Structure formats: C-alpha cells, structure tokens
A protein has these predicted regions:
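A conserved beta-strand-loop-helix scaffold within acyl/acetyltransferase catalytic domains
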Residues: 21-72
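Short, high-confidence coil segments that cap the C-terminus of an alpha-helix
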Residues: 38-39, 103-106
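Conserved acetyl-CoA-binding loop-helix of GNAT-fold acetyltransferases
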Residues: 72, 78-101
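Short amphipathic alpha-helix that is part of the acyltransferase structural core
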Residues: 1-30
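Conserved beta-strand-loop-alpha-helix junction that forms the acyl-donor binding cleft
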Residues: 109-134
Length: 161
C-alpha cells in the first residue's frame, strides 16, 4: 500500500544517495533540496519502504513547481511491472502536490526536466501518463524549452481549468 508523508528525507537515505553513482546526487543534500522553499516536501512509501521523494516548491509570482528535487530509489526505478510502467512521481506525488496547491489557492503550477537525449518525446510520454492521474479540473500544457534558474529545461504548465 502506498502512502505519502510530509517530512524531510531521512539522513541515511541522503547518505546512500551521496555514496551512489546517481548523476544528480549533488542535488540531494539537505542544503540543495531547498526545503525552506518547499510548500510541502513529500516522501512516498510502499508499506515501510521509501519509494522516493519530491517537493512542491514556491516559485516566482503565484506559481509553484511540482515534483521539485524528485528522487526515486533504485529499487523502484523500472520500466514495467506486470506489463505496466509505473511512474511514481506522476501517479502519486504530483496529484498530492497539486491538491495541496489547490487548497492554498494556486491556479498555475509547472514542472520541468533537464534536456535529455529525447526531450520532446520524453515530455510528451510523461504528460500522456500523468494525465491519467491529474486531479479533476487541472490540465497539463507543454511549454517547450525555458530557462529555469540558469538551466535550460523543458517545461510543462499545470493549469486549473
């Protein structure tokens, strides 16, 4: 059974990430997680095992970033389980964070990802998957490439309709 708990990640998990070969491991320290900028920071569990984490980050104006500093543990990174690919951030964390933002009066959110080998294809596949789980009254809208804190990223708006 999956559940979300709002808390900071346990230090043992951050230590495991720091000693791993994860190419983004420098983002996953208490300092670099930017917890002070998070409206909420969510840990996703399956029973008593941590699946991953991400935050809903305050941004410019009345905007917030969904799935900021998202990390999924290696045990849960996969392509298919029982013939279905599970994208934990989009099935569990994003819907939770969108609902938190809605309760606080947000009507415009976004998420972004660094540009990888197949940027548009990856973004489109993620939107298609995430749309299955988006809370009622919200929609995803792909924006293309934007500068986010000095890094060129692919961006998707999440808008209250």
């Amino acid at each position: 059974m999956f559940k979300i708990i709002e808390d900071k990640p346990p230090q043992w998990l951050l230590d495991n990430i720091a000693s791993s070969t994860d190419k983004l491991k420098s983002n996953y320290t208490l300092e670099r997680l930017k917890l002070e900028q998070m409206i909420c920071f969510c840990l996703l569990y399956e029973d008593d095992k941590i699946v991953g984490f991400s935050g809903l980050q305050k941004f410019e104006g009345n905007t917030a970033r969904v799935n900021s500093r998202c990390y999924i543990t290696p045990e849960y990174r996969q392509y298919k389980i029982r013939n279905e690919r599970v994208r934990y951030p989009w099935k569990y964390l994003a819907p939770y964070q969108i609902k938190v933002a809605e309760k606080l009066g947000y009507t415009k959110l976004f998420w972004s990802t660094e540009l990888y080998k197949r940027p548009e294809k990856t973004m489109n596949l993620t939107i298609k998957y995430a749309t299955q789980y988006i809370p009622e009254g919200w929609q995803y809208k792909r924006l293309g490439h934007k500068d986010i804190n000095g890094v060129k990223q692919e961006v998707c708006e999440i808008l209250k309709s």
